């Protein structure tokens, strides 16, 4: 039973994203350990590429992981902590007490992290449009065709599923009738705006993916003997 429950906990962790990189903490190898006791206590230890990763990003990941694991059926308690970080004690204590970011860093933080999460989700949506549209551009689709496309017109793919999910999180149109190319406010991109919009989307995607590769490299350097051991 504990093996099945651990698998369920791991699947829950698959839904927890690094907000800046838009990748699951499991894929990024940020999960140091994940165990579940016979009485249903799930213990998860997260790690990050550097000792000084931003506290706000770090707090989001630990808090999201705690919420995701706590929601797994059969888990009676979730102990989720962050190791080897300059603010580990504050983050771990704040998440355990469900104090929120402001309550945890009362002398430094003035706002909760909802707006930060929204900013990075917006970037993920922009980058996702490039991932989905790029094969169409490479196949010869022009601005008029791209501006007219809906999500239902696009071949199914993991990138399309991810784009729909991120749009849903932001309250943006994400059904089959929704335009493929959207501005951040949900308005359709016109054919005249397509080249500049896709240029911005491509640069955003490249920036996110480059940062992701840097983080993976830093993690391997920091934990050369402990990568992929969770």
Which positions does each model-derived feature cover?
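Domain-level signature for proteins that mediate thiol-based redox and metal-cofactor handling
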Residues: 1-51, 56-230
């Amino acid at each position: 039973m504990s093996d099945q429950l651990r698998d369920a906990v791991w699947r829950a962790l698959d839904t927890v994203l690094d907000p800046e990189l838009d990748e699951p903490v499991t894929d990024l190898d940020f999960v140091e350990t994940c165990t579940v006791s016979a009485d249903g206590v799930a213990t998860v230890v997260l790690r990050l590429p550097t000792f000084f990763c931003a506290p706000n990003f770090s707090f989001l990941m630990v808090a999201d992981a705690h919420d995701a694991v706590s929601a797994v059926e059969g888990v009676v308690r979730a102990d989720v902590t962050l190791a080897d970080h300059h603010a580990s004690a504050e983050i771990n204590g704040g998440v355990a007490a469900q104090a929120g970011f402001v309550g945890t860093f009362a002398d430094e933080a003035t706002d909760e992290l909802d707006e930060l999460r929204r900013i990075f989700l917006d970037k993920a949506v922009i980058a996702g449009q490039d991932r989905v549209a790029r094969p169409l551009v490479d196949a010869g689709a022009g601005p008029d065709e791209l501006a007219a496309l809906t999500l239902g017109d696009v071949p199914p793919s993991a990138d399309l599923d991810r784009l729909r999910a991120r749009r849903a999180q932001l309250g943006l149109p994400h059904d089959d009738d929704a335009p493929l190319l959207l501005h951040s406010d949900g308005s359709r991109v016109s054919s005249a705006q397509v080249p500049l919009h896709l240029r911005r989307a491509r640069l955003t995607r490249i920036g996110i993916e480059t940062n992701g590769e840097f983080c993976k490299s830093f993690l391997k350097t920091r934990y050369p003997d402990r990568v992929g051991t969770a």
